[in-house]
Amino acid sequence: MKSDSPVHRESHTGCQSPCPLRCLPARLEGSTKRRLAANARERRRMQGLNTAFDSLRKVVPQWGEDKQLSKYETLQMALSYIMALSRILSEAERYSRTDPEEWTNIQYDHIEEEQCLSYMEVRCPRDCDRYLPQTFSH
């Protein structure tokens, strides 16, 4: 019994066998391979994204060491940090034309002496040097 239904004709397309059921495993196998390949690509993409977030977390200031920042919090902190650095640079440029010492005094007026010493001892996080050339290579 041959069926002329659209389903039978579609599943039979390109198949040399008189029975469409014989073609089904080959089609499923091809579909499964494509799905596995797509899953592997997505897994690599997500691993790359997570690695990038881990790298960003290492260079963005964090208030506490008790918990890892979420991706959203990491992006928010990075944005705040970039804006603060940008503000500092624009203020420094503005004051450097008139009175550089005044700018320095403004920056350090609110810092106690012992805090200032601890800030001066702060070192760049491990692997920091690795990111700077990439960031400012333009």
UniProtKB/Swiss-Prot annotation:
> Which SMART domains does the entry link to?
HLH
Tell where it localizes.
Nucleus; Perikaryon; Cell projection, Axon
User: What InterPro entries does its record include?
Assistant: ATOH7_bHLH, bHLH_dom, bHLH_transcription_factors, HLH_DNA-bd_sf
Which CDD domains does UniProt cross-reference here? bHLH_TS_ATOH7
Q: Name one GO molecular function term.
A: E-box binding
Domain bHLH, first and last residues per copy? 33-85
Q: Which residues form the signal peptide?
A: none
Q: Keywords assigned by UniProt?
A: Cell projection, Developmental protein, Differentiation, DNA-binding, Neurogenesis, Nucleus, Transcription, Transcription regulation
- What Pfam families is this protein classified in? HLH
**Which terms in the GO cellular component ontology are assigned?**
axon; nucleus; perikaryon
An example Gene Ontology biological process: positive regulation of transcription by RNA polymerase II
Q: Which domain of life is it from?
A: Eukaryota
Q: What is its main location?
A: nucleus
Q: What else is known?
A: Inhibited by Notch and ESR1.
- What's its job? Transcription factor that binds to DNA at the consensus sequence 5'-CAG[GC]TG-3'. Positively regulates the determination of retinal ganglion cell fate and formation of the optic nerve and retino-hypothalamic tract. Required for retinal circadian rhythm photoentrainment. Plays a role in brainstem auditory signaling and binaural processing. Regulates the differentiation of olfactory receptor neurons. During retinal neurogenesis, activates the transcription of several genes such as brn3d, coe3, cbfa2t2, glis2, elrC and xgadd45-gamma.
Q: What is this protein called?
A: Transcription factor Atoh7-a
